[in-house]
UniProtKB/Swiss-Prot annotation:
Protein family per UniProt: Belongs to the ubiquitin-conjugating enzyme family.
Species of the source: Homo sapiens (Human)
Annotated Basic and acidic residues bias: 1-10, 21-45
Organism ancestry: Eukaryota, Metazoa, Chordata, Craniata, Vertebrata
Composition bias, Low complexity: 46-55
Protein name: Ubiquitin-conjugating enzyme E2 E2
Gene name in the database record: UBE2E2
GO (cellular component) term, any one: nucleus
Length: 201
């Protein structure tokens, strides 16, 4: 009886001891594995991002130099501050249009994928236009599906100026203004001039 009792007593303490030893080893080893893996992952992500930023930043710097030396008619654009990816643009209402005399401010945001993805361009100044909504979003094909890396921000601004001269009621962003443009042009033009005077001068 005493021998059996001794075996029973010895058995748990031996297995318990080895189990504690295993646990201590696994606890000590696992954090090391967890620390090493994320570092490798972060390194890969940052190198890809750095390459994208380098490519896009060079292209944006080049376009900035070009638009500074030779800006499109009635347009100007450049970085808001130190961030090369955030620009502010000014467009003067085209002469002879219902927006003549207005000064319109736009925000331009380039992504790290530029020029392979279009810039985001929005009006900050309110404007009465069937292709520009109240949030300043512009319905322009080259800012969507017809974008090409061969295009530049200068060409985008020229296209926006053309849109101010000749709107596209066939592809409207604001249906009510497009309908008014086609059915009551005089009232449309009166409203557009009124908004220009109120918000853009």
């Amino acid at each position: 009886m005493s021998t059996e009792a001794q075996r029973v007593d010895d058995s748990p303490s031996t297995s318990g001891g080895s189990s504690d030893g295993d646990q201590r080893e696994s606890v000590q080893q696992e954090p090391e594995r967890e620390q090493v893996q994320p570092k490798k992952k972060e390194g890969k992500i940052s190198s890809k991002t750095a390459a994208k930023l380098s490519t896009s930043a060079k292209r944006i710097q080049k376009e900035l130099a070009e638009i500074t030396l030779d800006p499109p008619p009635n347009c100007s654009a450049g970085p808001k501050g130190d961030n090369i990816y955030e620009w502010r643009s000014t467009i003067l209402g085209p002469p002879g249009s219902v927006y003549e005399g207005g000064v319109f401010f736009l925000d331009i945001t380039f992504s790290p994928d530029y020029p392979f993805k279009p810039p985001k361009v929005t009006f900050r100044t309110r404007i009465y236009h069937c292709n520009i909504n109240s949030q300043g979003v512009i319905c322009l094909d080259i800012l969507k599906d017809n974008w090409s890396p061969a295009l530049t921000i200068s060409k985008v601004l020229l296209s926006i100026c053309s849109l101010l001269t000749d709107c596209n009621p066939a592809d409207p962003l604001v249906g009510s203004i497009a309908t008014q443009y086609m059915t009551n042009r005089a009232e449309h033009d009166r409203m557009a001039r009124q908004w220009t005077k109120r918000y853009a001068t």
